[in-house]
Amino acid sequence: MFPNLNHRMLSVVDLFAGVGGLSEGFARARTDGKPIYELRLLVDKDPEAALTYRTNRPGIPYLVEDISNVAQKDILSKARVRKGDLDILIGGPPCQGFSVLRRNRALDDPRNEMMRVFLRFVRGLRPRLFMIENVPNLLVAAEGKFWREIRDFVSENYIVKAAILNACDYGVPQWRKRTFIVGFRKDLGVDDFSFPFVEETRKISPKQLTPHLGDEELLPIIRPWISTEEAIGDLPSLRPGGEASFYTQEPFTDYQAARRKDSRILANHIARRHDEKFLQKLSKIEEGGSNQELDGRRRFDRGREIKYLSQAYGRLHRKGIAQTITAHFLNPGSGRFTHYRDLRSITVREGARFQSFDDDFVFYGKMQSQQRLVGNAVPPLMARALAEYFGSMMLGQ
């Protein structure tokens, strides 16, 4: 099916790379203990994302440029491949027009033009496989019209499938549903393929993890869920405005140990400041609770015409699972981002833990920029699971 591919590492180009969550997953992917992929090039117009990635991974080329202004021949040149020889093209083109709050705006939203830009690179570069990560609503936007447009745009040369996957099924301690679109080039002889996912996503409560399926019922790639405490419980306790640069206890879960690796210094563990009046009100929310569970006099949206979302000012539960980490998780009012133990919002490092970044991956820039980079990233462990699954297919294993 894929002649000669099992004798070399597979080449990868990442467009709309951001801080490199997808690329991190592909870089971590292994088969028989050996790396599967070689990252040839990352491209994004965000200089802050580039600074963070280049500092962490200085040996991998990162082009800071608006991809819509980059010629396809330049991508091939910088990635050191010829047209048709690139193994995998990956990316998460921004499509904010498909977010839950904007589900009625799809094809007419100019922010969704970047999806078409990515697909033009698929046509022009002709990779053996392409993978797109995006928001779940992409598949239903405009009554499915945009998804059909994506499929039809490349269907002449690719077998294309899509699935909505949940990060918590792949070792990521976070409830995060995302759409993945994968296409195999038809001349490779792939008649059909599937995604590694459970038919019905396991159910949870915001407060308490429900029992996951027994391991014998799971595909090998599917992992038991990881609770909030299992993910971040080893990180030092902080007061608002406080910070910690060193670990104060040993990891007590495999997940914590894996994220630490050999790290000795703790980066990005700085708590946002909150005023006393705000903290007094926040203290009334119990572990696992939210603003909606407060009585009328105590609610944060008291007297407001527009009521807050159900997860606003939500507090994590140590035995529960983190909700979707967004680009605004330093703000307790934007979701369930208040620490279960400490009276504060979670830190950038805790957000990165929920996203499955290793502790030695340091985020640079102002805190507001750091939270954006973390929240917009593809969880590396989720990317790794898919990279290993499809990589094994390409290598005939």
Regions inferred by a protein language model and the residue ranges of each:
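A short, structural micro-pattern
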Residues: 37, 173-175, 226, 319, ...
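C-terminal target-recognition/interaction regions appended to catalytic cores
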Residues: 237-397
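Class I S-adenosyl-L-methionine
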Residues: 78-83, 100-300
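Short alpha-helical segments and helix-capping/turn motifs at coil-helix boundaries
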Residues: 74-75, 163-168, 307-311
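Short Gly/aromatic-enriched secondary-structure transition segments
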Residues: 59, 196-198, 340-344
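Glycine-centered loop/turn positions within well-structured domains
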Residues: 96, 189, 213, 332, ...
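Core alpha/beta nucleotide-donor-binding catalytic domains of modification enzymes
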Residues: 2-126, 136-140, 144-148
